[in-house]
Amino acid sequence: MKIWIKTGHPTGEVVRVFGFDWFRLHFIENPGMAWGWEFGNETGKMILTLFRLTAVIFGTWYIGRIVKQQYSKGFIICAGLIYAGALGNLIDSMFYGMIFDKGLHYDAAINDYISYGGIAQFSSNGYSSFLHGSVVDMLYFPIIKSNFPSWFPVIGGDEFEFFSPIFN
């Protein structure tokens, strides 16, 4: 699904799934981790990718352990979904920079990540190097959009959205 999104949609595009307002595909690329947190430059990106590799190795061991110990199916499924997300992010980080012609990438001249226009295509001349690809995120579930009550301390009246993160 990630490859279909990356090669068929421009970044920022939003598609309602089955016409629902609360389930959308919203294509973004993320150089960091959840909620857009990042370690900064290319070195930080490499450290994050190596951390992902370590997490996937640990996750492989852990999934095997909980299956052998016959944990509940629900727990195994939840752990498996988390593991699948981590593995997908690792694959994106390791290889997407080498196999696509466009992607969110770090520009040392401005010390920031820059986006791109258009739709990415497969290419032998990637937009980045091994361990420096950006993660494709697209699942967005804005289930509740409202405002905090005005009497609420500090953030009273501010907009509130549950569930605002875009993930994969």
Q: Which functions belong to the PLM regions below?
A:
Residues 1-168:
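Alpha-helical transmembrane bundles and membrane-interface segments of multipass inner-membrane proteins
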